[in-house]
């Protein structure tokens, strides 16, 4: 027997596969959309569909209307009564017999027409009324079969008929007029499509199968025990039909349109409110879950948040958080992670990662620079003077330059890095003067990085000091030669050999001992040995053969930067190679700009400058950081883009580092949450001093007091700085800067703690005092007396009283005591009673007998030792 696929049959009858499977289940054929059926099963399905199509013709249509209103009635008593009135109207519309005849003429081969079904239903109802408990007429089987078939399928066909007649508007050909309330007529347009010949055969076969099926149901009904069971069944059937009819009228008979091509349209004269039929939406969005993991190609350009990384990988953020937890990272959905970690997570989850470098523009702008002819020429040497504080570094430079810079410095100590150049024997030498204070470590490190030769100044009366050792370490790390200048030889102290011996510990050997270091004895006060030192510098520089490119675009290093009140951001730079011209576009760290002015160390305006010459430049967009590299570029727009990108990158790294530190120190923060802290706002004249002050103050933090620098900057104290300090209860520290008029008014109004300083160690000393005042004092117990127990008495009020003699010190009442027996402490308590004979006394001195009463202790023995303590407060 030929087998037919369910999907092919669905295409043949113009029906969805799922709908056809449901039809098969209704008639008892259990199939899925991938199964096949036989010819007999196909015939059964087609008969069922044709039966539904045949019975889709509806004869009766009921319309129900309700009108509610309220009527006010005036009574004689003056009170009004409201009566609710409800008017119900039922309209019944039916088709004429001519329409039924027309339908039957076109379906001659159908064995059972609609009129016969109605008549058989009436006879069937009479038979059911005469049904009794004893016997049942055997003819009921046939009529009940028809009735059951009609009751089951006729209502369904009525629903299908309404929808099919609505969809086929073009084939309406008949209108029925029915008068209102059995007199009015309504026009119907009814078109019956030509049924295919094969559908007629299928329908007749379906009738036979349905009769057999319904006969089985009736036989089950006839076996019911009594009439009451039958009445219950009949009542349930009627209620069910009524519910279905109301539901179908409410849903406007919305069924599959491919089962019929008929439609009904009521005239506008009948309808005051049109019936709105809604079609079932055929467009449905179906989500198909992927069967396997999808690996994507992810492009990572920079640091990225967890949320954005999840969007790129098309996964939930929680999955990435779980993955990072397994890798040992604790993150949140909005936390930013760096490029390396994001790449690791993406590759761990099976995705392919492509790294896109956003600094391509920076690389391009650096490659596009003009390096001139590339010929290197001899350049002046850069000499950095280093040493301990107050060893005479600035005085030595003043003697060489014939200036008096040291006399004008606050506290006679250098706190800024200075850059000068002088001409000796037609040769230029550049000097960098570095601070010697311990706070200026970063300045000394920058000086050692850019220098060619280091002059280490050591005072003959002081010898080797901590900053001397630090300067040696910086110079050795930069691999630059060191010339030792032993200063203050005008003092009658012969300590040179001792200094040489101490320097050997740090690999500094004089030439006469077979080493590479030149030792020169000088006096910055009298000028003795200065000429020898300069000759040693020139000799050492010739040996180094210092050369660089003297033309092309310049590049150098920022030595110091500050904000000039009249000129704006100013940077002291040292050109390493190339030539800097006025009007060049420069890129310096996070800043950029066009060079508006170039000034040398004597404040002379110059148009261009070559290598190894320190100058001041104006025109930058902001204050650069000391130590930033400065280069000349071609395009100002590209320089601005690179500077903006660097700022963005720096902020992302800073935020990521802060979040990481917070997550690592979360438990320590909980412990320290109750500890006090000191908030500070710092404003300085130059960038280097600001860096040194911040570094020194942060080192003062301890376990109990934490130093928080909530704001810092270069320039004068503004209104914004004062408001920040007032809001956070902070101290404002001004180093060689002053507050403007508006800031002074707010300082007085808000009573902000504001302090001026010109010497860095004054800041450190005062902050130390503030921290000591904030620390909680510590207490220490000190032994003030010893007593030996000689006898024991009993008192009804106090208890046991020890008769003692004071052996050392003094015994005071209400002091803390400690009882020792055989040099072992057996009790610690309080002395509550002290008597001399029968008098109460406050203290007893050495060699005097007394009676001592102790609190909550009676186990005292003769020859016990009583130690008396006093609590002393110790300030931190």
UniProtKB/Swiss-Prot annotation:
Record localization: Cytoplasm
Region G3: start-end pairs: 433-436
InterPro entries: DNA-bd_dom_put_sf, EF-G-like_DII, EFTu-like_2, IF2_assoc_dom_bac, IF2_II, IF2_N, P-loop_NTPase, Small_GTP-bd
Region feature G2, mapped onto this chain: 412-416
MF terms (GO), sorted A to Z: GTP binding; GTPase activity; guanosine tetraphosphate binding; translation initiation factor activity
Chain sites annotated for binding GTP: 387-394, 433-437, 487-490
Region called G1, residue ranges: 387-394
Region (G4) residue spans: 487-490
Location of the tr-type G domain: 378-547
Region named G5: 523-525
Keywords associated with the record: Cytoplasm, GTP-binding, Initiation factor, Nucleotide-binding, Protein biosynthesis
GO cellular component: cytosol
Domain of life, per lineage: Bacteria
PROSITE patterns: G_TR_2, IF2
Entry similarity comment: Belongs to the TRAFAC class translation factor GTPase superfamily. Classic translation factor GTPase family. IF-2 subfamily.
Function: One of the essential components for the initiation of protein synthesis. Protects formylmethionyl-tRNA from spontaneous hydrolysis and promotes its binding to the 30S ribosomal subunits. Also involved in the hydrolysis of GTP during the formation of the 70S ribosomal complex.
Protein name (Swiss-Prot/TrEMBL): Translation initiation factor IF-2
Lineage: Bacteria, Pseudomonadati, Pseudomonadota, Gammaproteobacteria, Enterobacterales
Gene from which the chain derives: infB
């Amino acid at each position: 027997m030929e087998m037919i696929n369910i999907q092919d049959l669905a295409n043949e009858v113009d029906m969805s596969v799922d709908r056809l499977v449901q039809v098969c289940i209704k008639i008892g054929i259990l199939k899925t959309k991938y199964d096949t059926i036989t010819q007999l099963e196909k015939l059964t399905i087609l008969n069922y569909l044709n039966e539904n199509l045949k019975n889709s013709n509806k004869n009766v249509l009921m319309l129900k209307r309700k009108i509610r209103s309220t009527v006010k009635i005036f009574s004689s008593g003056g009170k009004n009564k409201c009566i609710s009135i409800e008017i119900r109207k039922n309209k019944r519309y039916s088709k004429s017999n001519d329409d039924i005849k027309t339908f039957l003429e076109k379906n001659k081969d159908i064995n059972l027409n609609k009129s016969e079904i109605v008549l058989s239903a009436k006879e069937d109802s009479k038979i059911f009324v005469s049904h009794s408990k004893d016997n049942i007429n055997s003819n009921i089987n046939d009529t009940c079969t028809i009735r059951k078939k009609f009751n089951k399928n006729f209502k369904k066909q009525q629903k299908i008929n309404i929808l099919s007649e609505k969809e086929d508007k073009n084939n309406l050909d008949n209108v029925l007029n029915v008068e209102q309330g059995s007199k009015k007529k309504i026009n119907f347009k009814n078109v019956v499509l030509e049924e295919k010949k094969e559908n007629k055969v299928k329908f007749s076969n379906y009738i036979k199968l349905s009769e057999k099926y319904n006969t089985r149901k009736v036989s089950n009904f006839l076996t019911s025990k009594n009439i009451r069971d039958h009445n219950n069944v009949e009542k349930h059937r009627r209620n069910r039909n009524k519910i279905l009819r109301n539901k179908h009228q409410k849903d406007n008979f919305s069924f599959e349109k491919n089962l019929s091509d008929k439609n009904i349209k009521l005239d506008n004269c009948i309808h005051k409110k049109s019936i709105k039929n809604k079609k079932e939406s055929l467009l449905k969005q179906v989500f198909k879950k992927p069967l396997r993991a999808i690996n994507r190609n992810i492009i990572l350009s920079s640091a990225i948040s967890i949320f954005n990384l999840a969007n790129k990988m098309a996964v939930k953020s929680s999955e990435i958080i779980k993955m990072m937890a397994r890798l040992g990272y604790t993150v949140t959905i909005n936390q930013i992670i760096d490029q390396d970690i994001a790449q690791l997570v993406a590759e761990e989850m099976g995705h392919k990662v492509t790294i896109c470098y956003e600094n391509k523009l920076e690389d391009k702008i650096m490659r596009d620079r003009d390096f001139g002819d590339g010929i290197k020429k001899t350049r002046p040497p850069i000499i950095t003077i280093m040493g301990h504080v107050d060893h005479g570094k600035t005085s030595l430079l003043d003697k060489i330059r014939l200036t008096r810079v040291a006399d004008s410095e606050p506290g006679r100590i250098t706190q800024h890095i200075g850059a000068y150049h002088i001409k000796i024997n037609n040769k230029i030498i550049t000097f960098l003067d570095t601070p010697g204070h311990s706070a200026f470590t970063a300045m000394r490190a920058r000086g050692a990085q850019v220098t060619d030769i280091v002059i280490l100044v050591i005072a003959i009366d002081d010898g080797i000091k901590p900053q001397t050792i630090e300067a040696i370490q910086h110079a050795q790390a930069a691999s630059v030669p060191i010339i030792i200048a032993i200063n203050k030889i005008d003092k009658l102290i012969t300590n040179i050999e001792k200094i040489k011996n101490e320097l050997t510990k740090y690999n500094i050997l004089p030439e006469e001992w077979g080493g590479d270091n030149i030792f020169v004895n000088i006096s910055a006060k009298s000028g003795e040995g200065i000429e020898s030192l300069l000759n040693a510098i020139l000799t050492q520089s010739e040996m180094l053969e210092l050369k660089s490119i003297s033309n092309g675009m310049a590049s150098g290093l920022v030595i110091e930067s500050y904000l000039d009140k009249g000129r704006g951001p100013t940077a002291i730079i040292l050109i390493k190679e190339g030539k800097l011209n006025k009007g060049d576009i420069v890129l310096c760290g996070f800043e950029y700009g066009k060079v508006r002015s170039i000034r040398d160390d004597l404040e002379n305006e110059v148009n261009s400058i070559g290598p190894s010459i320190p100058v001041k430049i104006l025109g930058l967009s902001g204050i650069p950081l000391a130590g930033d590299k400065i280069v000349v570029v071609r395009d100002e727009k590209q320089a601005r883009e690179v500077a903006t990108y660097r700022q963005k990158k720096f902020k992302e790294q800073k935020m990521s580092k802060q979040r990481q530190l917070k997550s690592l120190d979360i438990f320590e923060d909980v412990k320290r949450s109750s500890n006090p802290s000191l908030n500070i706002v710092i404003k300085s004249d130059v960038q280097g001093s600001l860096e040194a002050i911040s570094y020194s103050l942060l080192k003062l933090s301890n376990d109990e007091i934490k130093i928080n620098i909530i704001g810092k900057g270069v320039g004068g104290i503004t209104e914004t700085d004062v408001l920040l300090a007032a809001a956070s209860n902070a101290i404002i520290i001004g180093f060689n800067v002053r507050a403007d008029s508006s800031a002074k008014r707010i300082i007085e109004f808000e009573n902000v703690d504001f302090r001026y300083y010109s010497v860095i160690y004054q800041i450190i000393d005062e902050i130390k005092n503030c921290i000591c005042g904030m620390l909680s004092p510590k207490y220490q117990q000190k032994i003030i007396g010893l007593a030996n127990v000689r006898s024991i008495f009993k008192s009804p009020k106090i208890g046991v009283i020890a008769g003692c003699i004071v052996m050392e010190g003094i015994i005071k009442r209400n002091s803390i005591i400690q009882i020792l027996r055989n040099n072992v402490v057996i009790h610690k308590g309080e002395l509550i009673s002290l008597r001399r004979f029968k008098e109460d006394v406050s203290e007893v001195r050495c060699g005097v007998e007394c009676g001592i009463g102790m609190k909550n202790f009676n186990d005292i023995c003769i020859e016990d030792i009583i130690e008396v303590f006093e609590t002393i407060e110790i300030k931190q």
